[in-house]
């Protein structure tokens, strides 16, 4: 069971041929912000998985995830407005950031696997008109950090160091290792 409203996470699981169902946890992410970025995404992933695990009475394994971009020590979730997205991109263009995704898998027998995966992202040096055109697509408003690697935002990324799928919202290599553990 995927405890996430993210279409990108669903697509990753579908493309990897991992059977799943979706149940959105309803965890209010906006009320939880008093942690550093790594602890924040881990806390939210665990909260999402825990809520859904309880709702389905532990009948299926539950995967919760949450992602943020850390840029210059600041946490960037989804930008609220086009103005905010544009302002962030002005800062991010030509610079490195860290995309953190917290993962939590709760098995039917109550075993908890929990880990945060971090991928370093180098954003392309962009002109004001490139930023304006990208923000006008609306895509930056849908994603943590204000970009979708699997969409037009992929054109705005120069280089990645770490897990590619993590930047989309879910580390498939981590999930594969975990599925091997819980299926032993």
UniProtKB/Swiss-Prot annotation:
Localization, UniProt: Cytoplasm
Reactions catalysed according to its record: a ribonucleoside 5'-triphosphate + H2O = a ribonucleoside 5'-phosphate + diphosphate + H(+); a 2'-deoxyribonucleoside 5'-triphosphate + H2O = a 2'-deoxyribonucleoside 5'-phosphate + diphosphate + H(+)
Molecular functions (GO terms): nucleoside triphosphate diphosphatase activity
SUPFAM superfamilies in the record: ITPase-like
The keyword Cytoplasm appears for this protein: yes
Pfam family, one: Maf
GO CC aspect terms: cytoplasm
Gene Ontology BP term (one): nucleotide metabolic process
Domain of life: Bacteria
Coiled-coil segments on the chain, per record: none
InterPro entries on file: ITPase-like_fam, Maf-like
Known cofactor(s): a divalent metal cation
Keyword set, alphabetical order: Cytoplasm, Hydrolase, Nucleotide metabolism
CDD domains with a match to the protein in the record: Maf
Catalytic EC class: hydrolase
E.C. no: 3.6.1.9
Annotated catalytic residues: 66
PANTHER family: BIFUNCTIONAL DTTP/UTP PYROPHOSPHATASE/METHYLTRANSFERASE PROTEIN-RELATED, BIFUNCTIONAL DTTP_UTP PYROPHOSPHATASE_METHYLTRANSFERASE PROTEIN-RELATED
Main function: Nucleoside triphosphate pyrophosphatase. May have a dual role in cell division arrest and in preventing the incorporation of modified nucleotides into cellular nucleic acids.
Family: Belongs to the Maf family.
Protein's UniProt name: Nucleoside triphosphate pyrophosphatase
Organism: Prochlorococcus marinus (strain MIT 9313)
